[in-house]
Structures are given as C-alpha cells and as structure tokens.
C-alpha cells in the first residue's frame, strides 16, 4: 500500500502546482488589461476610476433637447451602476433614452455588451437607473442616445463615458 501513498502525494502536488499556475495566468491577464490604462479607444480614456460620466449639452439654437447624461459606476464585486437621462426644454410627444453598455479588453474596440431602450410620451424627461453584474477583467463604458420629438421635429444627441476597469 506504500506505493499508492506516493502516487497520491504526487497527484496532490501536481494539483497544487496546476492550481497555482492557473491563478498566476489569471493575474497575468489582469495585468495585461491594466497595461492599457490611460490609453484612448474610440474617444474613451481607459481608467481605473470608480465612476465616469458623459454629457450631451444642446447647442444654443436647440428648441427641444436640453441635455443628455450617462454615468457608470464601479459598485464592487463585478457590479456596475448605470444611470442615464434625457431632458427636454418643454414637454414633448416622445422622449427617448437608449443606453448602451460596451466593453473592451483594452487592446481592441469597445463592443456592445447590453442595451436598454427607454421611451416616455408627452413629458419632458426620461431616466433610467440600474445595477448589472458584468464579467470582470474588462473596461466598461456607457454610450447614450438622447432624443426629444415634438410636432414631427426630432432633436437628438449622443453622450459617452470613459472606460472604467472592472476587476
């Protein structure tokens, strides 16, 4: 029975080494992603900040669309907080807020991860706020599409945050 004991010890050692190697690999991937801190992808700076906001401010001659905002927060544990709003100067027939959650590994473009479309009628604003669980090891950002429609006239604009690292 002594041979068996030796085998078990070897297996145990191998498993321990394997586990160690795997965890080191995970750390490496994270380090690689963090190597891209400070770079800009598609207009968004890659940051390790806990939150980032983006704003669309209407041009002076705009009649209906006042402003649009998006904000992303790192809530810890792989959760991000998502906030968005579209505000019109007056009550409009249709008020829209589309929020796009996008992610990048720092090495490539931002890709669509999740999206929400919000619409309200005969009002002057629409907001959304939620918390979602995301995959760790990526930079996440929000893009907002904001529009106010009245009497057949549409005014719209876009907003975007920087990328925040979720690890």
Please state what every model-predicted region is.
Residues 1-73:
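N-terminal prepro-regions of secreted/extracellular proteins
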Residues 125-133:
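Exposed aromatic-hydrophobic patches
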Residues 142-144:
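Hydrophobic/tyrosine-rich beta-strand signature of extracellular beta-sandwich/beta-rich modules
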Residues 61-101:
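Short, surface-exposed binding/anchoring microloops in extracellular/periplasmic proteins
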Residues 151-167:
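Short beta-strand elements
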Residues 110-123:
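Solvent-exposed serine/threonine-rich low-complexity stretches and specific carbohydrate-binding patches
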């Amino acid at each position: 029975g002594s041979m068996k004991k030796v085998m078990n010890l070897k297996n145990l050692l191998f498993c321990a080494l394997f586990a160690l190697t795997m965890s080191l690999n995970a750390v490496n991937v994270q380090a690689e992603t963090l190597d891209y801190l400070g770079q800009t992808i598609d207009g968004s700076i890659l940051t390790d900040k806990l939150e980032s906001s983006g704003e669309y401010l209407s041009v002076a001659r705009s009649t209906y669309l006042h402003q649009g905002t998006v904000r992303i927060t790192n809530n810890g544990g792989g959760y991000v907080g998502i906030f968005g709003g579209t505000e019109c100067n007056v009550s409009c027939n249709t008020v829209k807020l589309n929020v796009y959650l996008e992610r990048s590994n720092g090495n490539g473009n931002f890709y669509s991860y999740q999206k929400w479309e919000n619409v309200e009628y005969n009002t002057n604003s629409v907001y959304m706020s939620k918390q979602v669980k995301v995959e760790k090891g990526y930079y996440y950002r929000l893009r907002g599409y904001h529009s106010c429609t009245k009497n057949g006239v549409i005014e719209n604009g876009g907003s975007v945050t920087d990328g925040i690292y979720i690890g």
